[in-house]
Amino acid sequence: MSTTVIILAAGKGTRMRSQLPKVLQPLAGRPLLGHVIKTAKQLLAENIITIYGHGGDHVKKTFAQENIQWVEQAEQLGTGHAVQMTLPVLPKDGISLILYGDVPLARQTTLEQLIEASNKTGIGMITLHVDNPTGYGRIVRQDGKIQAIVEHKDATEAQRQIQEINTGIYCVSNAKLHEWLPKLSNENAQGEYYLTDIVAMAVADGLEIASIQPELAFEVEGVNDRLQLAALEREFQKQQAKELMQQGVTFADPARFDLRGTVKVGHDVRIDVNVIIEGDCELGDFVEIGAGCILKNTTIAAGTKVQAYSVFDGAVVGENTQIGPFARLRPGAKLANEVHIGNFVEVKNTTIGLGSKANHFTYLGDAEIGAESNIGAGTITCNYDGANKHKTTIGDAVFIGSNSSLVAPVTIGNGATVGAGSVITKDVAEQSLSFERAQQISKANYQRPQKLKK
């Protein structure tokens, strides 16, 4: 049976006190709505219909690359009204999963269970047992079957003792949605159309309402303010760290780790405190990441050790390499095996060969460096002429003396040596020594200036 995912994302989010629409607030490096869309795609839904309202243009622009049908809810007249807006584009057959743009972490496996259960009955929902159900709609059952959802303010004292609550996540046959949604009424204290009313309609039609429980409570938690957003962030990060530890990662402190994307890990990876991983990363066997490092869209091969406060973005690092502390690898940095990149070294759009080293205070941009070369402290590849970038090529077994400036485009041949303090503007031949500096002048018995007496 074909599946449609309907996402309600029209809310204003007043309590966020933000100019950014609520569903665009970030959680683990991705907008709230982005999490929901990602899950919908994992479910292989044939259609994703997103209902937008406040900040609609901004929301649509953010997800312009996604294959989504957008439906506007110009007036926010309740959850039932929001789903009513989809009827003109909602298929007549199949089943629809109803999700929320501010409930970002419902997992694929949980939703697949709901879809499977709902396919058998025509309607299903996710419920949750909680210790304190105050404020939530209660699930009223008879002989184990769902009979009604009673809002807290309308519940009897006996019903208020019920600890099973409505999460608002439903899966309903499209045929029934086309039948029930036009019948919704706004004759209530709020003057709104409630989606929960379809439960009573299902019972009246003699349908059994399937229900499942999520494995993790935070899967169905919504976000209304920044306190809830922060709390959900920490719950999610805790769960991600747990899953990585189950894969063999050792954390110095799992509570001080943030994953804002995906990471594939090998065996015996060690991660120190306050590490942030963003985008899509991969860490090989026995990789060690020091405290305070940031990794984004980076691959690090087996045995490499990264010391504290190093930053990676779009880098590829070979095996048994030593990096940091305070190193920066920018997009296009490609390091072979057994490379050393030391403190305050920046590498951008540069390939570095086997065993080469740049241990201190160096900028390597738009360069190609061969194997077993040594780049002295303070070396700079001068790659930018004010208008265009140019390439520096350094061969194998090259020695670059400290405080050298290599003005691109320039090539340093295999086995060449560049003397310290040189400004190299011409190609250097293989196995040669090149240096360029002013002649040293020494003045004997030099007297330093004295301070004037006031």
Curated annotation (Swiss-Prot):
Pfam families assigned: Hexapep, NTP_transf_3
Subcellular location: Cytoplasm
EC number: 2.7.7.23, 2.3.1.157
GO MF entries: glucosamine-1-phosphate N-acetyltransferase activity; magnesium ion binding; UDP-N-acetylglucosamine diphosphorylase activity
Keyword terms, alphabetized: Acyltransferase, Cell shape, Cell wall biogenesis/degradation, Cytoplasm, Magnesium, Metal-binding, Multifunctional enzyme, Nucleotidyltransferase, Peptidoglycan synthesis, Repeat, Transferase
Binding site for acetyl-CoA: A377, N383, Y384, S402, A420, R437
Signal sequence interval, chain numbering: none
UniProt-listed Gene3D superfamilies: Hexapeptide repeat proteins, Spore Coat Polysaccharide Biosynthesis Protein SpsA, Chain A
Catalytic activity: alpha-D-glucosamine 1-phosphate + acetyl-CoA = N-acetyl-alpha-D-glucosamine 1-phosphate + CoA + H(+); N-acetyl-alpha-D-glucosamine 1-phosphate + UTP + H(+) = UDP-N-acetyl-alpha-D-glucosamine + diphosphate
Pathway named in the protein's UniProt entry: Nucleotide-sugar biosynthesis; UDP-N-acetyl-alpha-D-glucosamine biosynthesis; N-acetyl-alpha-D-glucosamine 1-phosphate from alpha-D-glucosamine 6-phosphate (route II): step 2/2; Nucleotide-sugar biosynthesis; UDP-N-acetyl-alpha-D-glucosamine biosynthesis; UDP-N-acetyl-alpha-D-glucosamine from N-acetyl-alpha-D-glucosamine 1-phosphate: step 1/1; Bacterial outer membrane biogenesis; LPS lipid A biosynthesis
Disulfide-bond pairs as recorded: none
Cofactor(s) required for function per UniProt: Mg(2+)
Sequence positions that bind UDP-N-acetyl-alpha-D-glucosamine: 8-11, 22, 73, 78-79, 100-102, 137, 151, 166, 224, 330, 348, 363, 374
Stretches the record annotates as Linker: 227-247
Binding residue positions for Mg(2+): D102, N224
Alphabetical list of CDD domains matching this protein: GT2_GlmU_N_bac, LbH_GlmU_C
Quaternary structure and interacting proteins, as annotated: Homotrimer.
UniProt function note: Catalyzes the last two sequential reactions in the de novo biosynthetic pathway for UDP-N-acetylglucosamine (UDP-GlcNAc). The C-terminal domain catalyzes the transfer of acetyl group from acetyl coenzyme A to glucosamine-1-phosphate (GlcN-1-P) to produce N-acetylglucosamine-1-phosphate (GlcNAc-1-P), which is converted into UDP-GlcNAc by the transfer of uridine 5-monophosphate (from uridine 5-triphosphate), a reaction catalyzed by the N-terminal domain.
Identification of the protein by name: Bifunctional protein GlmU
Lineage: Bacteria, Pseudomonadati, Pseudomonadota, Gammaproteobacteria, Moraxellales
